[in-house]
Amino acid sequence: YLFYPKPVLNVGLIRGTTVDTHGNLTFEEESINSEALSLAMAVKQCGGIVIAQAKYKAAAGTIHPRTVHVPGIFIDYVVINEDIHTHQQNEASAYNPAMAGNIKADLAEFPKLPLTEAKVIARRAAMELKKGTSINLGIGIPQNIASVVNEEKCGKYVTLTSESGTVGGVAITGKAFGNCWNPECFLDEDVQFTWYCGGGLGAAFLGLAETDERGNVNVSKFGPRFNG
C-alpha cells in the first residue's frame, strides 16, 4: 500500500455565489461544487485560514440553511467580487443558468458533431454503454460520447457523471468540460470519487497522452512540456 503523510494546509481559497454576514456560503450560480467544503474543513483543522470569494453579500438569517454549502464557521475572510471577468462560472461562460441547474436547456437544439475520426471513436465507445449504469467520461475524445448519447437520444438509459461532481445531464465538451447541461445533481468532488472508488461505475471512458501494447497509460508527461 501507499502511505501519504498528512499535509499541513495554511491557506484555503474557495468561491461560491452568495455569502451572508456570518460567512455562510451558497453555490446557486455555480456549475460545480468542487471540493470547497472538504478543503475548508481540512484547512481549519490544520489551524490555517480560509478565504472565500463570492458574487453577492446577504444579511445573516436571509439565506435558507438548506442552500448553505460551506458554513461560516469554516471561513475566515470573504471577498465580494462583482466583476464577471474574474468570477466566471467556468472558462467558457460567465454564467449560464442551465449549467447551474436553474433552468433546463433544450438539448434538441444542440448541433451535432461533424463526422470525424473522433466521432467514430466516440460512437464505437457508446456502443459499450449498458442500460441503467453510471458512466464517467474523461477529457479528450471521451467527452464526445456525451454528444453522441444526446444525438441518439439514449441519455434516459444511462447516467453520465463527471469527476467534478455532476450527475446526470449531458457533459459539455471544450473549455467548459467538467460541467454539464441540465444536471440532476451536484456532488462534492471527493464524494464523487468515493462513489467511483467503491465500484459504482458501469464504465469509464478516459483520456490519455499515450499508451503501449500492454495497456500502460501515460496521462501526465507530454514530451518536453509540463502539464498544468
Feature roles, as predicted:
Residues 1, 163-211:
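Ligand-binding beta-strand-loop-alpha-helix segment within the catalytic cores
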Residues 1-152, 157-161, 166, 182-186, ...:
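Metallocofactor- and cofactor-centric catalytic cores in central/energy metabolism, strongly enriched
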Residues 201, 210-228:
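Gly/Pro-rich active-site capping loops and adjacent beta-alpha segments
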